UniProtKB/Swiss-Prot annotation:
Pathway: Cofactor biosynthesis; coenzyme A biosynthesis. Residues 153-328 are annotated as: Inosine/xanthosine triphosphatase. Its cofactor is Mg(2+); Mn(2+). Its EC number is 2.7.7.3, 3.6.1.73. Reversibly transfers an adenylyl group from ATP to 4'-phosphopantetheine, yielding dephospho-CoA (dPCoA) and pyrophosphate. Phosphatase that hydrolyzes non-canonical purine nucleotides such as XTP and ITP to their respective diphosphate derivatives. Probably excludes non-canonical purines from DNA/RNA precursor pool, thus preventing their incorporation into DNA/RNA and avoiding chromosomal lesions. It catalyses: (R)-4'-phosphopantetheine + ATP + H(+) = 3'-dephospho-CoA + diphosphate; XTP + H2O = XDP + phosphate + H(+); ITP + H2O = IDP + phosphate + H(+). In the N-terminal section; belongs to the eukaryotic CoaD family. In the C-terminal section; belongs to the YjjX NTPase family. It is found in: Cytoplasm. InterPro entries: Cyt_trans-like (IPR004821), ITPase-like_fam (IPR029001), Non_canon_purine_NTPase (IPR002786), NTPase/PRRC1 (IPR026533), PPAT_arch (IPR023540), Rossmann-like_a/b/a_fold (IPR014729), YjjX_NTPase (IPR050299). Binds 1 divalent metal cation per subunit; can use either Mg(2+) or Mn(2+). It comes from Thermoplasma volcanium (strain ATCC 51530 / DSM 4299 / JCM 9571 / NBRC 15438 / GSS1). This is Bifunctional phosphopantetheine adenylyltransferase/NTP phosphatase.
Amino acid sequence: MITVVGGTFSKLHKGHKALLEKAIETGNEIVIGLTSDEYVKRNKVYPAIPYKERYRNLYNYMVKKTNKFRIRPIDDRNGNAPYERDYEIIVVSPETYQRSLKINEIRIQNGLPPLKIIRVPYVLAEDLFPISSTRIINGEIDGNGRRLKPVKVAIATNNSAKLKATNDFFHKLMKNFDVIQNTDYKLETQQPFGEVTMNMATKRAMQSLGDNDYAIGIESGIVYERFSRKYFDFHYCVVIDRFGNVTRGSSSGFEVPDRIIDLIKRDMSFSQAYGKVIDTNGIDDSTGIVGKISNGRVRRYDLIMECIRNAFIPRFDPDFYDTTYTPP
């Protein structure tokens, strides 16, 4: 039986190799459908790399792995997969998974058994976006996913702790990045409650995206918890990327006394309300009120860092969250 995999393979990268390795693991003979030059000219945004060159690079890689393979030209997205009786398995990326479902529909209409579909997860570059030939050709990343151009991260804030936490978080993830501070944003209220907190964080991010890779909005707000009938202070983070994907995360919450809530409801900010109860002199952005009342055991910086980290969790495994990366 035969395992089929298809693609353009303009720049043979880690994502392509993951597909090919998975095909080899099936133990079947492998048929690789390699798109023709005509197909590339019709469907790709980058300059066409000649079929012969793509064939040679693909052949040289595969021949080191197995001798049970053939490379054949295809001139459309489906290739021969809807019609070949000997095809048993198709190996696809997340981008081509829906196409494989369509291929199986056509096979069934043609009286052929559906192919077993093996979906290979995204292979992410250093910047947590999928490796692709387009990005390599554009000089954005190399074939291993190392970022060549700085990752541009925008954050809407005047708060030094939010700015520092964003820098520190990205420093743990990657080497090549720039954090751009956006101070030109509008707030609806000094102290948001409930869903208004999430809405304001989202607007902060949206007002900062522009042509950046990521935009981050962080907002602290008061959330009412019905079981205990208490109010809690949370930090909420929204991350929007250049593909339009939105992820969210929150920090741990700590209880806010009722007398503080009463003051906040009189249109005071969180800091102003606490200033009526405790001495807030000398409290900086990183320490925050939580640092004062916890005697330094927990700082506002820690809560900000936590909400950023949690907002990025879905980005570490986009397949688990069914994330797609459609170019803007």
